C-alpha cells in the first residue's frame, strides 16, 4: 500500500485463528487500498486489500466494544473488535470498501465504453 492516502491509523483487536481464539492488539492503518495490520514487534505487517474483501458485516455492540467481521473473497472471515467510543473503525472500513468498489466499477464501465467506441469506426452507425 505504498503512496496510498491514509484514512485512519490506530488500534484494533483481531481474533487469532488458533485453538483459543485470543484477541491480539494490532496497529492498523486504513488507506484507500485496504487495511494493513502490524503486530507489537514492529513487523512489516499483513495487508488486507479491498480487492480481496467481499464485505464487512456482523456488527455487534457489547459492553463498550464493537465487534465486526471482514469477509474475504475466499470466504475467510476475520474478526475484529474495538472500543465503542472514539473512532468508528467498522464504519470507516465499510465506507472505504464501498468507495473502492465504486471506483473499480466506474473504471470498468469506462473501459467497456472506450472499448465499445474503439470497435465502432467513425463512419459506422449503430442501430
UniProtKB/Swiss-Prot annotation:
Primary residence: cytoplasm
GO cellular component: cytoplasm; plasma membrane
Residues in PH domain copies: 5-108
Keyword Membrane recorded: yes
Record GO terms (molecular function): phosphatidylinositol-3,4,5-trisphosphate binding; phosphatidylinositol-3,4-bisphosphate binding; phosphatidylinositol-3,5-bisphosphate binding; phosphatidylinositol-3-phosphate binding; phosphatidylinositol-4,5-bisphosphate binding; phosphatidylinositol-5-phosphate binding
One biological process term in Gene Ontology: intrinsic apoptotic signaling pathway in response to DNA damage by p53 class mediator
Keyword line: Apoptosis, Cytoplasm, Membrane, Tumor suppressor
Annotated localization: Cytoplasm; Membrane
Its membrane topology: Peripheral membrane protein
Keyword check for Cytoplasm: yes
Record text about domains: The PH domain binds phosphoinositides with a broad specificity. It competes with the PH domain of akt1 and directly interferes with akt1 binding to phosphatidylinositol 4,5-bisphosphate (PIP2) and phosphatidylinositol 3,4,5-trisphosphate (PIP3), preventing akt1 association to membrane lipids and subsequent activation of akt1 signaling.
Functional summary from the UniProt entry: p53/tp53-regulated repressor of Akt/akt1 signaling. Represses akt1 by preventing akt1-binding to membrane lipids, thereby inhibiting akt1 translocation to the cellular membrane and activation. Contributes to p53/tp53-dependent apoptosis by repressing akt1 activity. Its direct transcription regulation by p53/tp53 may explain how p53/tp53 can negatively regulate akt1. May act as a tumor suppressor.
Family membership noted in the UniProt record: Belongs to the PHLDA3 family.
PANTHER family: PLECKSTRIN HOMOLOGY-LIKE DOMAIN FAMILY A MEMBER 3, PLECKSTRIN HOMOLOGY-LIKE DOMAIN, PQ-RICH PROTEIN
The protein's name: Pleckstrin homology-like domain family A member 3
Organism, scientific name: Danio rerio (Zebrafish)
Amino acid at each position: 500500500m505504498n503512496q496510498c492516502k491514509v484514512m485512519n491509523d490506530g488500534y484494533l483487536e483481531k481474533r487469532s485463528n488458533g485453538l483459543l481464539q485470543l484477541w491480539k492488539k494490532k496497529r492498523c492503518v486504513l488507506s484507500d487500498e485496504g487495511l494493513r495490520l502490524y503486530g507489537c514487534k514492529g513487523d512489516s505487517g499483513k495487508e488486507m486489500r479491498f480487492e480481496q474483501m467481499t464485505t464487512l458485516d456482523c456488527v455487534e455492540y457489547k459492553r463498550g466494544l464493537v465487534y465486526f467481521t471482514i469477509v474475504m473473497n475466499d470466504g475467510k472471515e476475520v474478526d475484529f473488535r474495538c472500543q465503542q467510543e472514539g473512532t468508528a473503525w467498522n464504519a470507516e472500513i465499510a465506507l472505504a470498501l464501498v468507495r473502492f468498489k465504486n471506483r473499480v466499477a466506474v473504471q470498468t464501465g469506462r473501459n467497456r465504453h472506450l472499448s465499445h467506441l474503439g470497435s465502432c469506426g467513425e463512419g459506422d452507425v449503430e442501430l
